[in-house]
C-alpha cells in the first residue's frame, strides 16, 4: 500500500530494512522537495527568500502546529537541527553567575554531549535523574525541593521507549515553578499522539522531521511560550527566529 511512496529507497537496496528507531526510509517527496529547493535557488538567487519566508515557512509552521495542537503557528522557530535551538535556549542563561539544570540520564546524544560539556564550566550545576520505575516521583521531588533555571527532559526516551504521560507532565510543570522547561519531542513527534495545548505557554517543545515525521533531514522546530522575553547570546532573541 505504501511502497509506491518509497520507490527511490526501495530501488536502491536489495534487502529488507527494519528500523523501529534508526534511520528510516524517506518517501520520494523528500527528494523532490530537496531538488525543488535547489532549482528555486538557481532561478531566483537572492530573491529566493521571498517565497521561503512568505510561503514555505508559514505553511511548515501551520502543519507542525496542527500535529501538536499548538495555537500560534507564528511562534514556532525553525532550524536545521534541535541542537541549534536548544543551545540558543541555554545561552539565554550564560550571563548568570550560576545556572542550575535538572535533566535525566537518558537524553539523546546531542543534548547529553552538550550538557556534559557545559558541566565542565563552573557556571553550570547539572543534576540528572535516573529514568527508572520511580523516575516521576524522584524528578518531581527534586523540583519541589530545589530551584532550577532550566528543566530538560524527553517526552519519549530514546533508549527505553518510556513515555511521559500528560498527567506526569502536569505534575512536572506544577513542581517546576518558574523554571524554563524544554520538552524534547524528537522521539514522540509523529510517533505517538502529541497535544501540547495545555502547556503551550509554559514549555518549549522541540522536535524535527528526520525520524517518524518522514520529512528527511534539516527541518527542526521549537515552540515558544507566549510573550517569551528570553534573549539568547547566539541571536537577538528567540522571537526573531520566527520573523
Which residues does each PLM region occupy?
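Pyridoxal 5′-phosphate
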Residues: 1-243
Amino acid at each position: 500500500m505504501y511502497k509506491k511512496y518509497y520507490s527511490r529507497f526501495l530501488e536502491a537496496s536489495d534487502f529488507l530494512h527494519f528500523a523501529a528507531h534508526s534511520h528510516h526510509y524517506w518517501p520520494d517527496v523528500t527528494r523532490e522537495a530537496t531538488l525543488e529547493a535547489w532549482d528555486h535557488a538557481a532561478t531566483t538567487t537572492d530573491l529566493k527568500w521571498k517565497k521561503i519566508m512568505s510561503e514555505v515557512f508559514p505553511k511548515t509552521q501551520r502543519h507542525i502546529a496542527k500535529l501538536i495542537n499548538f495555537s500560534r503557528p507564528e511562534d514556532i522557530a525553525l532550524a536545521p537541527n534541535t541542537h541549534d535551538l536548544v543551545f540558543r535556549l541555554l545561552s539565554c542563561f550564560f550571563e548568570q553567575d550560576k545556572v542550575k539544570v535538572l535533566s535525566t540520564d537518558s537524553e539523546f546524544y546531542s543534548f547529553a554531549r552538550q550538557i556534559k560539556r557545559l558541566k565542565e564550566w563552573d557556571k553550570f550545576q547539572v543534576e540528572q535523574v535516573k529514568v527508572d520505575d520511580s523516575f516521576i516521583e524522584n524528578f518531581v521531588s527534586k523540583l519541589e525541593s530545589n530551584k532550577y533555571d532550566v528543566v530538560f527532559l524527553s517526552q519519549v526516551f530514546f533508549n527505553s521507549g518510556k513515555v511521559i504521560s500528560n498527567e506526569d507532565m502536569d505534575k512536572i510543570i506544577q513542581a517546576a515553578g518558574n523554571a524554563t522547561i524544554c520538552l524534547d519531542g524528537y522521539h514522540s513527534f509523529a510517533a505517538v499522539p502529541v497535544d501540547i495545548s495545555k502547556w503551550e505557554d509554559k514549555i518549549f517543545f522541540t522536535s524535527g522531521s528526520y525520524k517518524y515525521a518522514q520529512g528527511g533531514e534539516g527541518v527542526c522546530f521549537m515552540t515558544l511560550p507566549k510573550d517569551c522575553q528570553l534573549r539568547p547570546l547566539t541571536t537577538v532573541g528567540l522571537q526573531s527566529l520566527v520573523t
